Amino acid sequence: MNRIGLLWSGLIVLAAVGHACAATLDALQGAWAMNGTGCESIFKKTGRGMEFRDRDSSLNTGLIIKGSTILGPLATFKVAQIRRKGDRLSAALNCSDSIIYGNLAVSFRILSPNKFERYAPEFPEISVIYNRCNL
């Protein structure tokens, strides 16, 4: 998977949420794993909360949301803007890794307190489900 693909998958998430949606941002704080993957294989619990077991792994499908920052596999995302339309949120993210810096748009929908759906605004029929990890 190339770096742009990693940026896209890493994010996502969630992105989410920014200063304009504090209640939603609060609801998305924490560690999340892509549907079908085990939290134990992605995260470990530490004295400071959850951390990646191996963040550099190209097989990592997890996200950690702290404040307006989203940590994904190999990249970090900062929520720049957020807009709500019905039950869906769209976010503009500033993304960076050790080599590339860029912007990304992502949309998502909270399905329950422990589950959300991420999709590209241009292709809402293609989505990924994330589940909250509570180790």
What are these regions (language model features)?
Residues 38-40, 94-96, 132-134:
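Sequence contexts marking disulfide-bonded cysteines in secreted/extracellular proteins
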Residues 8-16:
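Bacterial N-terminal signal peptides
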Residues 1-8:
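Bacterial N-terminal signal peptides that target proteins for export
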Residues 60-112:
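Contiguous, well-ordered beta-strand patches that form the walls/edges
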Residues 107-108, 115-128:
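Short, exposed beta-strand-loop hairpins at the edges of beta-sheets
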Residues 17-22:
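Sec/Tat signal peptide C-region and signal peptidase I cleavage site
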Residues 29, 33-68, 72:
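Short, solvent-exposed loop/hinge segments that bridge or flank secondary-structure elements
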